[in-house]
């Protein structure tokens, strides 16, 4: 009987810890944040609850974008730096990258881009060079989102142009 109670108690406490776990439980400032996030699964929680729970990390939700019916990108401020995370429909973090600083002069964007005058079929995220007043802006830093593998793929910015309409941050506005 004691063994049965011990096993039951062990299952209860293990399940309780699992239920409280989220994608930020392994994150530590000064450590490899993308590595700590990838493979974690987050429960559906209100953002303010997550931010309060992980206040020591300076956690702040910076916005999200639906990439496909099974994949979203979410920007988080963690330990004073911005990170972009790919999250699958079930809450699994499939990839994460440090996202570069952006501003009105170098705005963040997400969307379709062009190369050599032709539209590219993939979705790109990154930072643009906002110095020009043109509708298409050159890329400073970018990743292509591989929707099948749910991964960020770093791409060279040379020759890549993205529309001003893809700018999504208040610091870079239209």
PLM regions and their residue ranges:
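Exposed acidic/polar residues on beta-strands and adjacent loops within beta-sheet cores, strongest
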Residues: 20-174
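Sec-dependent N-terminal signal peptides
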Residues: 4-14
């Amino acid at each position: 009987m004691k063994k049965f109670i011990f096993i039951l108690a062990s299952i209860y406490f293990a399940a309780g810890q699992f239920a409280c776990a989220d994608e930020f439980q392994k994150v530590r400032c000064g450590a490899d944040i993308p590595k700590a996030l990838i493979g974690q699964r987050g429960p559906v929680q209100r953002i303010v609850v997550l931010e309060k729970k992980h206040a020591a990390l300076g956690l702040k939700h910076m916005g999200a974008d639906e990439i496909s019916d099974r994949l979203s990108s979410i920007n988080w401020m963690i330990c004073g730096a911005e990170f972009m995370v790919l999250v699958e429909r079930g809450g699994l973090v499939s990839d994460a990258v440090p996202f570069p600083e952006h501003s009105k002069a170098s705005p963040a964007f997400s969307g379709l881009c062009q190369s050599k005058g032709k539209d590219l079929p993939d979705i790109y995220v990154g930072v643009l060079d906002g110095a020009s007043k043109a509708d298409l802006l050159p890329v400073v830093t970018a990743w292509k989102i591989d929707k099948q593998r749910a991964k960020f793929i770093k791409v060279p910015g040379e020759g890549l142009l993205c529309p001003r309409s893809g700018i999504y941050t208040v610091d870079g506005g239209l």
